[in-house]
C-alpha cells in the first residue's frame, strides 16, 4: 500500500513540475470543443503542424524540429510532405499510380446498418439500378432480425447462383467490410438460419470485394479515405448531408417507436451509401479522372 502511495505521489509531483504547454495543439476532441474557434486562430497564425497532423501523429516530425505545415512540405520527406502540400492546396485525393478495381458481369453493392451492438436491422443492396432494402423495425435479437438476415442472404446467394448458372461473373461490394463481416458471422451463429460455413466461404471468396481496400491501395489523401470523403470526388452527393453516427442512432430509436419519417431517412441514407460505393467503383474503373498523381 505505502509503496503505491509513494509512487502515486512521485507521479503527481512529476506532473506538477512539467512545464505547462503555452500554445494549443489540435487533437481529435477539438472538433466538439467550444474553444476551438479561439485555438484555431492561434494555430493558423503559427501554421502549426497539428492542423494537418493532430495529436501524436505529428510527434515524429516535431522530434525532428518540424513544427509547421510549411516546414513539413519543405522537408521533402516523400508522402508525408506531399500530403501536407495537398492538404494546404485542398486536394482531397492523390493517385498512387495505376488505379485498379475488380469488375463483374453481375454486381451488387451492399451496406449494413447495425444498432449499437444489439444487431443488424438493415441490409441494403443496390443491383441493376434498383435499391433492395431488407429491414426490420422490430426489437433486435429475435425472430424478426433472424428472418430479415435470412431473407437478405437467400436473395444474395440466389443472385450469385443464377450468375454462375448463366456462366457470368459475380461480385458483391461494400465499403470497409469489417462491420458487414462481423454481423454476417454473428447472424449465422446467433440464429442458425444461415449456414456458418457458407458465410465463411463467401467472405473469403474473391466475389466479396472490399472497395475500401482498393481505394487505400490506389490513393492517399490528407483528409482520410472514408466513403464520405471519396464519393464526392467521384461526383456523388448524398440526398441528405451530415447524417452522422449519433443522428442515425437517434433515428433508429425513433424508427423503432414507429416514426415513419425516421424510417425513411434511414432507408434513404443507406440507399445513398450503396449508390456511393457503386459511383466510386465506376469512377475508379474510368481511371479516377480529376485526381493528381502522388
What is each stretch, according to the model?
Residues 8-46, 230-294:
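Acidic, Mg2+-coordinating catalytic module of metal-dependent nucleases/exonucleases
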Residues 48-104:
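N-terminal accessory regions of nucleic-acid-interacting proteins
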Residues 115-118, 141-142, 179-183, 190-191, ...:
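Flexible loop/turn segments at secondary-structure boundaries
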Residues 95-166, 190:
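Conserved RNase H-like, two-metal-ion catalytic cores of nucleic-acid enzymes
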Amino acid at each position: 500500500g505505502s509503496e503505491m502511495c509513494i509512487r502515486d505521489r512521485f507521479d503527481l509531483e512529476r506532473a506538477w513540475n512539467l512545464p505547462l504547454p503555452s500554445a494549443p495543439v489540435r487533437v481529435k476532441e477539438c472538433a466538439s470543443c467550444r474553444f476551438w474557434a479561439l485555438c484555431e486562430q492561434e494555430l493558423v497564425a503559427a501554421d502549426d503542424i497539428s492542423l494537418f497532423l493532430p495529436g501524436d501523429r505529428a510527434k515524429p516530425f516535431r522530434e525532428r524540429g518540424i513544427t509547421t505545415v510549411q516546414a513539413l512540405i519543405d522537408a521533402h520527406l516523400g508522402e508525408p510532405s506531399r500530403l501536407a502540400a495537398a492538404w494546404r492546396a485542398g486536394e482531397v485525393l492523390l493517385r498512387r499510380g495505376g488505379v485498379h478495381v475488380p469488375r463483374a458481369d453481375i454486381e451488387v453493392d451492399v451496406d449494413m446498418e447495425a444498432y449499437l451492438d444489439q444487431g443488424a436491422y438493415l441490409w441494403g443492396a443496390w443491383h441493376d439500378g434498383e435499391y433492395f432494402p431488407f429491414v426490420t423495425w422490430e426489437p433486435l435479437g429475435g425472430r424478426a432480425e433472424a428472418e430479415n438476415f435470412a431473407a437478405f442472404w437467400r436473395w444474395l446467394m440466389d443472385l450469385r447462383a443464377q450468375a454462375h448458372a448463366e456462366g457470368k461473373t459475380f461480385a458483391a461490394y461494400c465499403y470497409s467490410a469489417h462491420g458487414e463481416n462481423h454481423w454476417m458471422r454473428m447472424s449465422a451463429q446467433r440464429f442458425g438460419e444461415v449456414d456458418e460455413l457458407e458465410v465463411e466461404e463467401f467472405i473469403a471468396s474473391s466475389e466479396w470485394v472490399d472497395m475500401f481496400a482498393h481505394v487505400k491501395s490506389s490513393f492517399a489523401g490528407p483528409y482520410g479515405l472514408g466513403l464520405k470523403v471519396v464519393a464526392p470526388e467521384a461526383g456523388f452527393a448524398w440526398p441528405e448531408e451530415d447524417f452522422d453516427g449519433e443522428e442515425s442512432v437517434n433515428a433508429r430509436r425513433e424508427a423503432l417507436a414507429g416514426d415513419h419519417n425516421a424510417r425513411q431517412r434511414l432507408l434513404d441514407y443507406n440507399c445513398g451509401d450503396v449508390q456511393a460505393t457503386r459511383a466510386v467503383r465506376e469512377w475508379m474503373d474510368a481511371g479516377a479522372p480529376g485526381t493528381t498523381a502522388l
